[in-house]
Structure formats: C-alpha cells, structure tokens
C-alpha cells in the first residue's frame, strides 16, 4: 500500500545528461559527463562549451579482469521469483508445480529456505549433472561442461536448515505437463549454473577532459561466459554491460582525439516501480532494510517474513 501511494503521488522532475562521441579506426565510443544536470540553464551552458573543433585528452585508461559469481542453488523463494520473472508464474502456482515434481520423485523437498547443500549431498552431484547435461535443454552447454572441476560455492553444511537447496534427483522426467517441464528446467538449469565456473569479464574504464569538463566511459566484455552460457539470458547482464550501443573504440592514455559529436539529452526522474510478485518476494526476504531506525533494522535483519 505504501509503495502504491508513493508511486501514485510521485512528481517527476527533469534532468539532463551531456555526452560526447569519439571515433578511432572507424569505430566510436560515447563518454558521459559524470554528473546529471538538474538545472536546464547549467546544462545548456555546459553543452555550448563544446564545439565541432573541440579536442579531448584521454587521461585515464584502466583495464581489469572481473568475475560474476555463479548463483546459488534455489530455495523456494528464489525459484518463485525466477519463475515469475521468466515465465510469469505466480508464487502459488510455482509451489504447486514444485510440490508435484517432488511427489513424482523428480526434485528434492521444495519448501526449503536454504540455498546450500551439505558435503554428503555434493558427493552425488557429479552423477546428477551427468544426467542433466544429456537433457535436450542443456545438451549444447553440456558438450563443454567440465564435471571434474565443479564450483562449490553452494556447498556449506552450516547454512543448511531443515532441508537443503532444491536439486533434481536423477529420475528421468517423463510425461510432464508444459508448466511442470518449465519448472523442472529451471531447477535443473540452476544446478548447472550453480556448479559452473564464474563468468569472466574484462572491464574497461576510460576518462577524458573536454573543454575543462570530465567525461567517462565504462564497459565490459565477456571473456568466458561460464555459468551464464546455460541460459544466455539478457537479465543476467550487470550494470557494466550496457544494453545500448555505447561503441567499441579503445583509446590510449595521453591521446588527443577530436570530438566527433556531442549531445544533451533531457530525461525525467521515475518513481520506484510497483511491486511484482518477484520483487515482493525479495522485499519479504529483506523486510528490515527500509526501516529507518538502525537498532530496529538490525533486530529484524535476518528474519524475513517467511517462506510463501
């Protein structure tokens, strides 16, 4: 109710983003002013400082290897969130289907709040994954999947509660309904993701100065997709992997480059979105984070509201 009122009463305000475009070897890259302009006059004054004769100096180029960790195995809430995001299944529907798969002995107990398995269960995982990679959904990924060096991030007996994380049992799925097949694929696919290598990326940050103003560009290129190759979803993209085409040109520190183009884009602030089932489940898990009183926030930090 509070989020709905906040969204309904939100008053949008304009702001402006200034960018320049540089070109090298037939490819370009956009650089953005690090601060948004809240004042139109200030934004237009900054824009007018740049001309077609402007030249920028590249003053910083930083490359580093970064890793995106494989996700943990599913507990019930995480499964419900992903089924809602990717397949528009409600939390109740996902639970009902997961329970049906459990009763058919295809998956472990679904009403679990843990995303980990103990070492004795891990001993059976290679054999289970060997069956998973023969399934039609994962056959292509399975051709290069290495069963000898599994990621053990989801293995921790101290974080297992009454029941361990959701995994498949190795029983061959037959005669599943369309919805059952979807949820089974999610659970089996998450097993593959969880035990796959990290996603390796090369991060590139560049900074330049144009007419006395700082501009920055940040991007990342996937070197080895690791776990992200299981489903190859765009939703797995991180903030350093922009959706738009910011360009691929790379410059050297100290280079002086003429400005190819520049622009000033007007945008507007947006309210926090209304809850979906997936985001509501996240809010239930993290119910203490938005409590203003620090002592009260710490008191409920690890509680959550419970498993749906």
What is the role of each PLM region?
Residues 3, 49, 82-86, 97-100, ...:
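Generic, well-ordered alpha-helical scaffold segments in large soluble proteins
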Residues 1-63, 160-225:
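Phosphate-backbone binding and catalysis cores of DNA-processing enzymes
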Residues 18, 32, 38-41, 97, ...:
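Extended, highly charged linker/hinge segments and catalytic-adjacent loops that couple domains
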Residues 58-62, 69-83, 108-112, 271-286, ...:
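Short acidic, hydrophobic short linear motifs in intrinsically disordered regions
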Residues 88-103, 293, 302-308:
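Short amphipathic alpha-helical interaction segments
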Residues 65-73, 87, 91, 115-119, ...:
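Conserved phosphate/pyrophosphate-binding and hydrolysis machinery centered on Walker-type P-loop NTPases
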Residues 14-24, 100, 118-122, 142-153, ...:
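A glycine-rich phosphate-binding loop feature that marks nucleotide/adenosyl-phosphate handling sites
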């Amino acid at each position: 109710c509070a989020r709905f009122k906040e969204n309904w009463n939100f008053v949008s305000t304009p702001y402006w983003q200034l960018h320049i475009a540089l070109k090298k070897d037939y490819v370009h890259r956009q650089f953005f002013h690090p601060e948004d302009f809240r004042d139109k006059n200030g934004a237009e004054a900054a824009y007018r400082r740049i001309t077609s004769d402007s030249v920028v100096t590249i003053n910083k180029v930083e490359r580093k290897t970064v890793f995106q960790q494989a996700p943990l195995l599913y507990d019930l809430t995480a499964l419900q969130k992903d089924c809602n995001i990717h397949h528009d299944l409600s939390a109740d529907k996902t639970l009902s289907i997961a329970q049906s798969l459990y009763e058919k002995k295809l998956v472990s107990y679904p009403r679990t709040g843990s995303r980990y398995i103990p070492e004795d269960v891990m001993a059976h995982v290679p054999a289970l994954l060997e069956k998973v990679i023969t399934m039609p959904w994962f056959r292509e990924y399975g051709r290069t999947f290495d069963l000898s060096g599994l990621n053990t991030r989801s293995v921790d007996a101290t974080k297992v509660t009454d029941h361990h994380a959701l995994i498949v049992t190795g029983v061959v799925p037959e005669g599943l309904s369309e919805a059952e097949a979807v949820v089974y694929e999610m659970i089996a696919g998450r097993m593959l993701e969880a035990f796959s290598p990290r996603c390796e990326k090369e991060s590139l940050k560049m900074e330049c100065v144009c007419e006395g103003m700082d501009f920055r560009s940040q991007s990342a290129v996937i070197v080895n997709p690791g776990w992200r190759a299981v489903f190859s979803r765009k939703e797995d993209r991180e903030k350093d992997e922009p959706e738009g085409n910011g360009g691929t040109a790379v410059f050297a520190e100290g280079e002086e480059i003429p400005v190819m183009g520049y622009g000033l884009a007007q945008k507007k602030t947006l309210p926090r979105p209304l809850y979906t089932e997936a985001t509501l489940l996240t809010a239930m898990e993290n119910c203490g984070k938005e409590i203003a009183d620090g002592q009260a926030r710490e008191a409920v930090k690890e509680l959550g509201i419970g498993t749906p």
